[in-house]
Amino acid sequence: MLLGDFGTSYSKFLDLASARPEPYIIPSKELRSVHRVTIATGHNGKRFSDRYVNELTVLARGGERLIAEDDFVLLDCGSRDIKFIHYSNGCLNNMGWNNECGASMGFSIELLERYYDLDFHELPLPDRPFSVTCGVLGMSRIFDAVQVP
């Protein structure tokens, strides 16, 4: 069984039929019609499978399977949107999908990384979060926070 998450920038795959399943990534611009999967999710998922599962459902089920905590928040910052799942006491508490204010944030973060040649593992965390209500409008705060040597 081949699973696929067909995002705008990257597509992620996992072949559960292999002896040691390992995920792999392909830039979405390199996808061709031969990239058919058993079950798909993501922005372009319906183009590559007859069985499509909503991204919030996939995020919630994956969190249940992979996270041993009763209380957690999952955040998926994608190229076109931001999704979150919140579990409390082992039960789904809340979920959301922002494709307006969150639009392009993942892509913008990736552009910043490439433009400034950043290693996000090396950057210090800010003392406090940015006080913005819109990701696109908050870009100036992010640019200000990136200090280039």
Model-predicted regions and their roles:
Residues 1-61, 71:
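N-terminal glycine/serine-rich phosphate-binding loop of ATP-dependent small-molecule kinases
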Residues 7, 53, 57, 102-106, ...:
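Electropositive phosphate-/nucleotide-binding environments in soluble metabolic enzymes
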Residues 8, 79-82, 112:
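Membrane-embedded alpha-helical core segments of multi-pass
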Residues 15-19, 86-91:
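Short acidic-glycine loop/turn motifs at beta-strand connectors
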Residues 39-43, 78-88, 135-140:
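Acidic-glycine-rich active-site phosphate/pyrophosphate-binding loop
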Residues 49-90:
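Conserved phosphate-binding catalytic cores of ATP/NTP-utilizing and phosphoryl-transfer enzymes
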Residues 67, 71, 113-116, 146-149:
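Structural signal for hydrophobic packing residues in well-ordered secondary-structure cores
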Residues 89-139, 144:
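Glycine-rich phosphate-binding loop plus the immediately following alpha-helix
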